Amino acid sequence: MAVRTAERVSREVSDNFVFQRSRLAYVEAAGRIAGRVLEIGTGTGYGVDIIAPHAEHFTTIDKTRSDELPPMPANVEFCEAKVPSLPFEDDTFDYVVSFQVIEHIKQDRAFVAEVLRVLRKGGKFIVSTPNRPMSLTRNPWHVREYTAEELGALLSGFIHVERLGVEGNERVWEYYEKNRASVHRIMRFDVLRMQWWLPRWLLQLPYDVMNRLNRRRLHRSNRVLTEAIEMDDYRLVEVHDRCFDLFYVATK
């Protein structure tokens, strides 16, 4: 069995629950952006064709270039770079977008400071990240996860922050509850609660293996439900504790 890392959002059908939710962030951002746009965290590039038509120029960066990256439209430039430092001049971009990335970054305050630096006055930072109260277990690929209050505090250097979240309908919740029960069956063997105190690097491979086995098993036993979830089963609302993701729009 090929094991796909949980570091990046996957288009594998067993990951449909997460993939459709992640697509929503791009679609919502596309209706808000214009001008020069920077994306931090290209991943496999599934958001490029969503954002690019709405931008005058779209720069997308990641620490490595994914083999799954699609051909780039004429107004798109891929840049290989590591954060928190950004290889751009001050006041370069009208919008910065970053989805499911900030939880992976050790120096999150330095990262936000760099976003502020490269944004023009009045520019906006659109960011999404998992809502910690909804996580079923520790993800060792994440340095940390945020509550709504914690993400708001991290973005306190902006003049205004619109605090939204992603919630799902009954179909989404049915899948979530089945997943929660499955994860609980696996984690009952962690009697020493090692997931909470072992180093992240030591947990990453076991997590990837068990996460992939769990999602594929859920798909086999709930094929119709897993494949039926669509982006429209999610929506943006004012943030609350039972949102799956946080989606904040911060204005410089």
Where are these regions (language model features)?
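Conserved N-terminal segment of class I S-adenosyl-L-methionine
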Residues: M1-E89, Y95-F99, R109-V112, A148, ...
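A short His-aromatic
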Residues: Q100-H104
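A short glycine-rich, Lys/Arg-flanked "PGG" loop and its adjoining helix->strand segment in the class I
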Residues: R109-K121
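Conserved beta-strand signature within the Rossmann-like core of class I S-adenosyl-L-methionine
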Residues: G123-T129
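Acceptor-substrate binding/catalytic loop of class I
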Residues: S135-A153
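Conserved S-adenosyl-L-methionine
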Residues: I159-R171
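A conserved mid-domain beta-alpha-beta active-site/ligand-binding segment of alpha/beta enzyme cores
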Residues: N179, V183-N214
